[in-house]
Amino acid sequence: MKKTLSIHSVRKDLILGSRRLSNYWWATIIFIGALGFLLAGLSSYFQVDLLPFTNSTDLVFIPQGIVMTFYGSIGVFLSLFLWLTIIWNIGAGYNEFNKDKGIVKIFRLGFPGKNRKICLQFNIKEIKSIKIDIKEGLNPRREIYLCTKDKRVIPLTRVGQPLLLSEVEEQAAEIARFLDVVLEGA
């Protein structure tokens, strides 16, 4: 939740999707590495030097060339998947809390298809609390959840790099204060 648009009775938190610098970095690095493996494997098969900075024709096609071609193909498909998630901006959206209309709207973009746009809408009266879930350790998790009276728990924070503890606490407190509900800790 990076940007917040707030007018006295409407609060809108924008959620960053897959268009993060780290995703651009990994998609590019994986593509370059995979392309190198693929070209080295194909060079050993065709006995033509497709990589200008090395002599890949000395590789024996079976087993080294086949393995390099296989790993290169898998890497190219993985980087293609990463680039498509960046282009489609998977996970982007917003959390809108509207006191005038009495609704909470959670909107996210998914993969193309009939369910590309995911929109959850709740009446503010259905909201029981805002919950903070903090797990420290090797893989830390710091998330904010919207808890409804019918026991549903909906995540409000973005996926990816965990927010600072102070940011999570501050955002959760602001949302709970805005909605006039209880703030829970896990």
Curated annotation (Swiss-Prot):
Topological category with respect to the lipid bilayer: Multi-pass membrane protein
InterPro entries to which the protein is assigned, alphabetical: PSI_Ycf4_assembly
Pfam families: Ycf4
UniProt entry keywords in alphabetical sequence: Chloroplast, Membrane, Photosynthesis, Plastid, Thylakoid, Transmembrane, Transmembrane helix
GO cellular component, one term: chloroplast thylakoid membrane
Compartment annotation: Plastid, Chloroplast thylakoid membrane
GO BP field: photosynthesis
Main localisation: plastid
Superkingdom of origin organism: Eukaryota
Function: Seems to be required for the assembly of the photosystem I complex.
Family: Belongs to the Ycf4 family.
HAMAP family: Ycf4 (MF_00437)
Name of the featured protein: Photosystem I assembly protein Ycf4
Lineage of the species this protein comes from: Eukaryota, Rhodophyta, Bangiophyceae, Bangiales, Bangiaceae
Gene designation per UniProt: ycf4
